[in-house]
Amino acid sequence: MQFQSTRDPNTIVSSSEAILRGLAPDGGLFVPTAFPKAELEDWKSLSYPELAQKVLAGFLTDYDPAFLGEAAAATYGDAFAGKAGYVQKVHDGLYSLELWHGPTCAFKDYALQLMPKLLVQAKKNLGRTETTRILVATSGDTGKAALAGYAGLPGIEIEVFYPDAGTSEIQRLQMATQAGDNVSVYAVNGNFDDAQTDVKRVFGDASVAEELEKRNICLSSANSINWGRLVPQIVYYFYAYFRLVEQGNVAWGQPVDFCVPTGNFGDILAGYYAKQMGLPVGKLVCASNKNNVLTDFIKTGTYDARRTFYKTTSPSMDILISSNLERLLYHVSGSSAKVAGWMADLAKTGMYTVDAETLARIQASFACGCADDTAGAAEINARFEQDNYLCDTHTAVAFCVAETVRSAAPMVVLSTASPYKFPRDVLAALGETAPESDFAAMAALNVKTGCPVPASLSVLNTLPVRFNTVIEPAAIRDAALK
């Protein structure tokens, strides 16, 4: 399996090189040149680690399959408390794929607990011995998951940049208290798009690469622009489907819809890849909050980032520049020239419009919708009161949208974070007066619902804060060169 840039068909690399580089030299993203076909009958009874090995081996063909099996077994064992790919029935025809039972209580753990192993092995595969410096822009959950995955690894340094005042207090403390001599964390005076734009600018700056090369350092990314972030996320779509069949909730071969709360389009794109591999996926439903640039795009074919940026109670989706959409555009248009043109238009004017054929292909696989904070809060309350099911603010957005687009097909909502990462907003949605402290809110939410508080979150206020530096977006370049 080879990988090419979305913007230049002549940029071809191995999977190891794609994972190590993160971003293509031309600014494009690496995509597979083909999709391996799933062996559904053979895979349906596999454990989560066994299934992960099969999916990974189809794409990462320059990795030893035995290594991939060992890496998956080491990743998806005790750290996920036996709940990797856990599917919970909410009510008839509606299910929640709970992806927050990992060490940092967010779906990012599925990729970022495994990806460090893939990166270290990629360096071995390619005979690379330099230090790898990983730059991460985060809207909240990616930062902590990446820090937890890469902390303490020899030959690896990681720098995380998050929007100051753009995360929950729990998310901020998860990053600011991270242990490890090879980690650095910076708050950025701006929003996620500001951080992501300047991180991508650093990757494209030849002078940065030249200076770091003198010091035997190369840059890489742990954001979902890196193929190594996407491929592990394909696994849980297959696993969820197999569990629904096993439980008697879905007939074998029956299409299932998946509703995904997304901002950067990576999680839902993994579902598209699963569909291309042969999983019976009906519609992939893109759920947005008030920052509904993706909703508008899927409906109209015009991507227009020239709009007000809103801070919402679902901050991990507060994004206007959705990086992974570029991969989908390449797959449905089949034209790197078109993609390069659209991305140039976006950089220059803040918008682009795709052709009618490309839009029709997108709409054939994707539906969409959006929900604001008020609707999300009402959904949290409704799901708890009607179904005794507690969800976080991001998952609530997906439940809202799922209700508006549901067909007769079973619907799986991807639950992307623990409700205890946003305890004040969840508690308020349940009609309670939320304390000022997130930790007091955690305790009150536990009393209200009886749902256990994840241990990794409950101890955060006892850990020393190591990082409290706030920088301007333009200073990300200096941090990368430190």
Pin down the residues of each PLM region:
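PLP-dependent amino-acid enzyme catalytic core
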Residues: 1-482
